[in-house]
Curated annotation (Swiss-Prot):
Top-level lineage group: Bacteria
Source organism per UniProt: Rhizobium meliloti (strain 1021)
Record lineage: Bacteria, Pseudomonadati, Pseudomonadota, Alphaproteobacteria, Hyphomicrobiales
GO biological processes: bacterial-type flagellum assembly
Entry protein name: Flagellar protein FlgA
CDD domains, sorted: SAF_CpaB_FlgA_like
Location within or outside the cell: Periplasm
Keywords: Bacterial flagellum biogenesis, Periplasm, Signal
Gene label: flgA
Cellular component terms per the entry's GO annotation: periplasmic space
Keyword Signal assigned: yes
Transmembrane segments: none
Main location: periplasm
């Protein structure tokens, strides 16, 4: 609670005064710390040339620059390691920051190709040929048509381009 002092100013209780001094000292030490003074400016990755949707990114197409705009919103790529090998979803213009939402992982399976379906249930393993009904990256849940029977099943794309079928 606040109390009015005889001078007319609002004053906090006597116990809060030392707490205010400790808070001020902590804020001053954070602002004046050598770590804050030595912190590197933020960086961003920008394209050197126009990159069109579907192109695979590599380090030769990109460069890292210091961010000079303090109002730049978060969500942009900060290092080339984050994007090396990814594929663009939309056109990237030279000199503009690359948003993480404009990139995707490279597809492990493509629509219409032939893949191996694997179904595991306990000790039983069944494999069959399948055809994905959509493009998908590793870890995506997609629908696949069994080439032999025509039955459509759902499964998860694995790193070796097989699809592990989900039990119904």
């Amino acid at each position: 609670m606040f109390r009015r002092s005889p001078g007319g100013k609002a004053n906090m209780s006597g116990r809060a005064q030392p707490a205010r001094a400790v808070l001020f000292a902590a804020m001053a030490s954070c602002l004046l710390s050598p770590a804050a003074a030595l912190a590197e400016p933020p960086t961003a990755v920008i394209p050197k040339q126009t990159i069109y949707p579907g192109e695979k990114l590599d380090a030769s197409m990109l460069e890292v620059v210091d961010v000079t705009n303090p109002d730049l919103r978060d969500g942009y790529v900060r290092s080339i390691d984050e994007v090396d090998g990814m594929v663009t979803k939309r056109t990237l213009l030279p000199g503009r920051v690359i948003l993480a939402s404009a990139l995707r992982e490279q597809y492990a399976v493509e629509r219409g190709s032939t893949v191996r379906l694997v179904f595991n249930n306990g000790g039983l393993t069944i494999t069959a040929a399948g055809s994905p009904l959509q493009d998908a990256a590793v870890g995506d849940l997609i629908r696949v048509r069994n080439v032999d029977t025509g039955v459509i099943v759902s499964g998860t794309v694995m790193a070796d381009s097989t699809i592990h079928v989900v039990a119904k």
